[in-house]
């Protein structure tokens, strides 16, 4: 049956394979009609290892490897080089690792991809996790800035380091897009279709609103993966972006 949504809409949605065993993740990704992108996070990667990235790519999928590297520059660069060599097309690092580490990571993803004939991935700098609330950020980490100001500072740091984009909550997308035009990518989790539970995310938005605000791609997990009809839930999200 022909899809009711455009390929462009499908490219904008990354389905997070969180909470799945390796076999479940592979079976799930194979069954969702029209799926283009999947996210492999820490839990799945630790269970399955690098092979899961290769297996998902063999299904014709594009992989967002969301391991959020945060270490000294040499270590971050080595990890990013190997992630790029696997064929992951989006890779995350923490912006607060600093400019030297970000520059080293960016150079490494280019080297890793080119040395193995893979597409050069987009390196994404994580700003402030969507589970953080402003009062906790100030109390627990002694960050005096508000979340919006902190996100803006970290995104600027990433852009100056030559990183290809950042990860932020949908609530910061509009202000960041005003500061950083395309092709600087803004990838946002914290996406919840109308009428679904927000779960452990506290800074959330619907898919159409996030795209309208300037997001490049959206990360959606449980509203699709825990649906009784994952293909239908994915199609509904895509259709919402097509209208």
From Swiss-Prot:
Pathway: Pyrimidine metabolism; UMP biosynthesis via de novo pathway; UMP from orotate: step 2/2. Signal peptide: none annotated. One of its GO terms (molecular function) is orotidine-5'-phosphate decarboxylase activity. It catalyses: orotidine 5'-phosphate + H(+) = UMP + CO2. The keyword Lyase applies. It is an enzyme of class 4 (lyase). Gene3D superfamilies: Aldolase class I. GO terms for biological process: 'de novo' pyrimidine nucleobase biosynthetic process; 'de novo' UMP biosynthetic process. Keywords: Decarboxylase, Lyase, Pyrimidine biosynthesis. It comes from the Bacteria. The active site is at 68 (proton donor). Its EC number is 4.1.1.23. GO terms for cellular component: cytosol. SMART domains: OMPdecase (SM00934). Catalyzes the decarboxylation of orotidine 5'-monophosphate (OMP) to uridine 5'-monophosphate (UMP). Homodimer. Belongs to the OMP decarboxylase family. Type 1 subfamily. PANTHER family: OROTIDINE 5'-PHOSPHATE DECARBOXYLASE. This is Orotidine 5'-phosphate decarboxylase. The gene is pyrF.
